[in-house]
């Protein structure tokens, strides 16, 4: 029998984004081809999807370290890098995704549901995408961003309509084996069942699912026995069925005391639950009592004697059956189906979320420094920390071995208002400023309060106005040298004489 795993810890690492490419178009007779570096591809995501073929988390248990594919780097000729392939993990219905701190991130309850557990990094821009009127031929590109890296906890909670609860060896596995096609392990010793078993009870025009939860003992809600690991499998059940051993011979135990002990554990477990399953409080869900093993001598007499007392004390329907002899099963099945149908009618329908409409709003220039925050560095004297999503992303994207890329970063930070904010905080030239994982000595490029001007880094002078001497101008200069004319006006108040023509003879 395959091992049942209902809790795993995954170490996820999404794909990194590919780096952008810095290249210039090279073609015969096209000296001014311009930048043509492509963008890097985005990194692959790690996606969890609910599959009806998955019934356990066993596959993920043996490979907890998962990494998605990296995005390809950009290339010349405007070729963008390929996107990294997503890593899709199939999980069974009822899987809950939690963070390391225990916060619920997603509840995957139905086939087809997906959740992006780790987002891939964005690819870096190539120099073709960075070109502008002020920076016509950038000699740099942006690096790709790293993908998300974190741990998540997956817990599987059975999606059953009815949950069978009871003390060990009460006959729960025997009951589910005769009511459905499930084939659980059956034995005459406690804790034979070490994993939940699910079965489908076919009632002709309808059907319902039933779960066999391993035996509970007093103190299960505090972790005694196997209870704490398996109590979560009854959180989603609409009906709880107490399976009671009517033939128990243990001193101090009887069907009523067994039911009371189990109810105390369920109440204690409910107080620790903070999840809304849309099924209501665990203590208020429908219940039935099943007095099993009525085929054993004296057990049937005891069950009939206690039936009225149980109904009067708890107010729940009581059924006397024998799973081994297959007696009393039909009335029990129809009663279970009736309770399940009532529960389905009462269950609130999920509300359709309102469509989110994004409406652009004007940005107040006076609030341009709201994208970051300047803090004093507690570890460095006269040091400052620049905290914000955008500045930290820009630091990751920058190739610090390229002076032009560093200049581009300085322009971006200046336009955002970082330099002005540092000056107002008291920072002066030479102070240590840390952004992300990079620390540097701050040298302000603009005075505080002055409008930032584009520096024009990366401008290709060949793309400016052509100042080369034309053929006609060379011809006239030759005439000057031969004495045919005294001078020639080149324009822009420049005069060519015999001496200057000889000096610039080979110009152009």
Swiss-Prot record:
Protein name: GTPase Obg
Cofactor(s) needed: Mg(2+)
Residues annotated for GTP binding in this entry: 166-173, 191-195, 212-215, 292-295, 322-324
One Pfam family named in its UniProt record: DUF1967
Domain spans labelled OBG-type G: 160-341
EC number: 3.6.5.-
Keyword list, A-Z: Cytoplasm, GTP-binding, Hydrolase, Magnesium, Metal-binding, Nucleotide-binding
The protein's role, per its UniProt record: An essential GTPase which binds GTP, GDP and possibly (p)ppGpp with moderate affinity, with high nucleotide exchange rates and a fairly low GTP hydrolysis rate. Plays a role in control of the cell cycle, stress response, ribosome biogenesis and in those bacteria that undergo differentiation, in morphogenesis control.
Magnesium keyword on record: yes
Major location (coarse): cytoplasm
Annotated GO biological process: ribosome biogenesis
Residue span(s) of domain Obg: 2-159
Subunit structure: Monomer.
Gene3D superfamilies tied to this protein: GTP-binding protein OBG, C-terminal domain, GTP1/OBG domain, P-loop containing nucleotide triphosphate hydrolases
Cross-referenced InterPro entries: G_OBG (IPR031167), GTP-bd (IPR006073), GTP-bd_Obg/CgtA (IPR014100), GTP-bd_prot_GTP1/OBG_C_sf (IPR036346), GTP1-OBG_CS (IPR006074), GTP1_OBG_dom (IPR006169), GTP1_OBG_dom_sf (IPR036726), OBG_GTPase (IPR045086)
HAMAP family assigned: GTPase_Obg
Binding residues for Mg(2+): 173, 193
Location relative to the cell: Cytoplasm
Family according to the record: Belongs to the TRAFAC class OBG-HflX-like GTPase superfamily. OBG GTPase family.
CDD domains: Obg
GO molecular function, one term: GTPase activity
All residue ranges annotated as the OCT domain in the record: 364-444
